[in-house]
């Protein structure tokens, strides 16, 4: 049989882009290029009338033991670990079973993903597939946040709280065994991987150990509970003992010491610093110095990202509400103004682009927007490309390295930081099939499908009474993976000590429980594409930020992609 040659455009329209093809991400200035294609030209599989995946053709006769449950065909994977590659993706029992070439091995060569009568198909042609996002800074103020996050492409939420309690409004802590157990029970109701942080502010270890054994996956130090050097040291000691992560919101007012005292209390131990720029809280004006240390894993919260002409004004109002400040009290105004600094906010964008800030998160309803972690990440990447040009690792043809650096900030790096990278955080074989499918024109802003544990949990869906799925109104709706016992496609993360605790088994939880591990030996060098450790200085009077002696300054954006164009309806 003679080969049939078609143009690259025709091929891309039929099977999606292949090696060397380039694609714009939504309306940004970010361009990606396919690095490798695992499918085989002429042997591609595609579902539909007159297409390949039919009995005796692309679909064979093998039983489910030898076939995948679901195949995503001809997908363009964008992942910090796997890269930017074209492949078929096979899902089995809720996990990623294979990334390669799907089909019928009885008649096709090179098949690594077997399609049989028991296989469902999701068309990935022309679609981008990413790992589900991980938001590691959640105030669990209301359960409706979970829907907002899921519909944005987030599939794992880590944080603390008990609902709209005053403590939860300000701090990401689920304190004490009773609250922890109730939140673990509530977690069973949601199509989202959840993990809770206990209150880490204590000068003696017993109450911290009690919380770790009760079911939290980590501990949170917050200045509103008193983040003193003694509390920091105690919390990190318990964390080292029990292999859980510590997150910190340090002392904005410098009451119990300056930034040097806090960094000294770390004693070189691993810690996740929240909103490390400082607008969300932390030693004023120089907590941003922490981002240069090898034991500090720094994250941002999304309101300061990227720096725009509106950032300063909205932050002052947010701060007054979130921390119960009174605009009629001079001391409260001074507190607010000390935290909101143009210079450090501008520097934050650049430190992200350098790979010195490793993670992005939301700070949901507590000076952060839970549905905008992914949007803000890509807006920041776009802004930095416009202002700083191509990264040294990139070529004139594409922004692949920058894209991998930025996607790592809300996928693999928070997974590594919190000890859950063995389960989530990347598109890799063996991990939970928490996958998000995007049309390229809507990348980063409005996903098409959100899979949890291999099952579709949410989708942009049209009128349920229509004759076809697409008529308006099209909006996000929960799918079958969000109901009943199918919620077991999500997991709850707890400590190993809690997993060994009979009191947890006595709760009768229905979701799988997964223990965190490997949190205490991490360093900044483990942060994928985001391991830079420049020496950061802040002038105490002018707030000028320098990294390795270079002044970090950029202009605020007046216009951004992924914004009003996508939210007219």
Curated annotation (Swiss-Prot):
Catalytic function, reaction form: urea + 2 H2O + H(+) = hydrogencarbonate + 2 NH4(+)
Pathway connected to this protein: Nitrogen metabolism; urea degradation; CO(2) and NH(3) from urea (urease route): step 1/1
Gene Ontology, cellular component aspect: cytoplasm
GO biological-process terms attached to the record: urea catabolic process
EC code(s) of this entry: 3.5.1.5
Binding positions for Ni(2+) 2 per the UniProt entry: 220, 249, 275
Pfam families per the UniProt record, alphabetical: Amidohydro_1, Urease_alpha
Residues that hold Ni(2+) 1 according to the record: 137, 139, 220, 363
Domain Urease: 132-569
Compartments in which it is found: Cytoplasm
Positions annotated to bind substrate: 222
Catalytic site positions: 323
Uppermost EC category: hydrolase
Record-linked PROSITE patterns: UREASE_1, UREASE_2, UREASE_3
Post-translational events: Carboxylation allows a single lysine to coordinate two nickel ions.
UniProt main location, coarse: cytoplasm
Coiled coil ranges: none
Cofactor dependency: Ni cation
Highest taxon in the source lineage: Bacteria
GO molecular function, one term: urease activity
Positions of post-translational N6-carboxylysine modification: 220
Cofactor binding comment, as recorded: Binds 2 nickel ions per subunit.
PANTHER family assigned to the protein according to its UniProt record, in alphabetical order: UREASE
Similarity comment: family membership: Belongs to the metallo-dependent hydrolases superfamily. Urease alpha subunit family.
Quaternary structure and interacting proteins, as annotated: Heterotrimer of UreA (gamma), UreB (beta) and UreC (alpha) subunits. Three heterotrimers associate to form the active enzyme.
Full protein name: Urease subunit alpha
Organism this protein belongs to: Dechloromonas aromatica (strain RCB)
